Curated annotation (Swiss-Prot):
It is an enzyme of class 7 (translocase). The chain crosses the membrane at residues 9-29, 75-95, 106-126, 146-166, 177-197, 237-257, 259-279, 299-319. GO terms for cellular component: mitochondrial inner membrane. Keywords: Electron transport, Membrane, Mitochondrion, Mitochondrion inner membrane, NAD, Respiratory chain, Translocase, Transmembrane, Transmembrane helix, Transport, Ubiquinone. GO terms for biological process: aerobic respiration. This is NADH-ubiquinone oxidoreductase chain 1. It comes from the Eukaryota. The keyword tRNA processing does not apply. The keyword Mitochondrion applies. One of its GO terms (molecular function) is NADH dehydrogenase (ubiquinone) activity. Belongs to the complex I subunit 1 family. Pfam families: NADHdh. Its main location: mitochondrion.
């Protein structure tokens, strides 16, 4: 009974609550970083240094009346934000920080499969809103996400060839002598840009395209459902950066001090997230055709070539003794 309680209630809560807290403070960090980059303060009224701003924001959104457009489809309209957040939080389960909540043998495949399911929540919300702006935003988001998933999958394949397994824990072991970002820096660069596009962040924020589509697929959402989408988006950003840190900046795992590994990984993920915000502050939005050209004409040939290269190298050098 107690074991069931721990595995089914306490363990999931112990990873969901910190993720949601991290998401809340990432929104504050974003506003602060953008503020200082635009030579202003950012939120600094609610609590010391504005630290309670995300809590006030969340409270404000959840106590608002959930307004639903009269022409929208009632069930799908409310189901999609819940689906988005559920998927975003489930994706954290196989993350080795340093021990995962669910020890999956094919962790990499699980992450890839679930992140592609997130497309349905965006498409469903755009369609259920019954608004042309929301639908255009949703269609753009789906096209963008599906396109960049191709390059993400191929990059993951190359990294798996390096590591020799689909289990996420093996990445930490494989990088004990050197971070994969050093021998595979082109992969790391392609991966980072693809994660920017995958999470719909600037300069690839076509889903939200404020100057064109009001707010994109979530234009008709207000209050609680909007907050769920918002949480899902930022949880995905943190997840992608944690995954980038695991894949390319692996933390050495000391069994006696697992907390050190967790702090190591989270520091790297936080720094990568700050670079996400820096990119947002620095770059204007791409044109849509340029975005598609980038992935199909540049990233796809490069990632395919790198997969073949990394496959060919060990076979070509198989006859050499290991000490060379």
């Amino acid at each position: 009974m107690i074991t069931t309680l721990i595995t089914h209630v306490l363990n999931p809560l112990a990873y969901i609550v910190p993720v949601l807290l991290a998401v809340a403070f990432l929104t504050l960090l974003e506003r602060k970083v953008l503020g200082y980059m635009q030579l202003r303060k950012g939120p600094n009224i609610v609590g010391p240094y504005g630290l309670l701003q995300p809590i006030a924001d969340g409270l404000k959104l959840f106590i608002k009346e959930p307004v639903r457009p009269s022409t929208s489809s009632p069930f799908l309209f409310l189901a999609t934000p819940m689906l988005a957040l559920t998927l975003a939080l489930t994706l954290w389960a196989p993350m080795p920080i340093p021990y995962p909540v669910t020890d999956l043998n094919l962790g990499v495949l699980f992450v890839l499969a679930l992140s592609s399911l997130a497309v349905y929540s965006i498409l469903g919300s755009g369609w259920a809103s019954n608004s042309k702006y929301a639908l255009i935003g949703a269609l753009r988001a789906v096209a963008q996400t599906i396109s960049y998933e191709v390059s993400l999958g191929l990059i993951l394949l190359s990294v798996i060839i390096f590591t020799g397994g689909f289990t996420l824990q093996t990445f930490n072991i494989a990088q004990e002598s050197i971070w994969l970002v050093v021998p595979a820096w082109p992969l790391a660069a392609l991966w980072y840009i693809s994660t920017l596009a995958e999470t719909n962040r600037a300069p690839f924020d076509f889903t939200e395209g404020e100057s064109e589509l009001v707010s994109g697929f979530n234009v008709e959402y207000a209050g609680g459902p909007f907050a769920l989408f918002f949480l899902a988006e930022y949880a995905n950003i943190l997840l992608m950066n944690t995954l980038s840190a695991i894949l390319f900046l692996g933390a050495t795992h000391i069994p006696a001090l697992p907390e050190l590994t967790a702090m190591n990984l989270m520091t790297k993920a936080a720094l990568l997230s700050v670079v996400f915000l820096w990119v947002r502050a620095s770059y204007p939005r791409f044109r849509y055709d340029q975005l598609m050209h980038l992935v199909w004409k540049s990233f796809l040939p490069m990632t395919l070539a790198l997969v073949l290269w990394h496959l060919a190298l060990p076979i070509a050098l198989a006859g050499l003794p290991p000490q060379i």
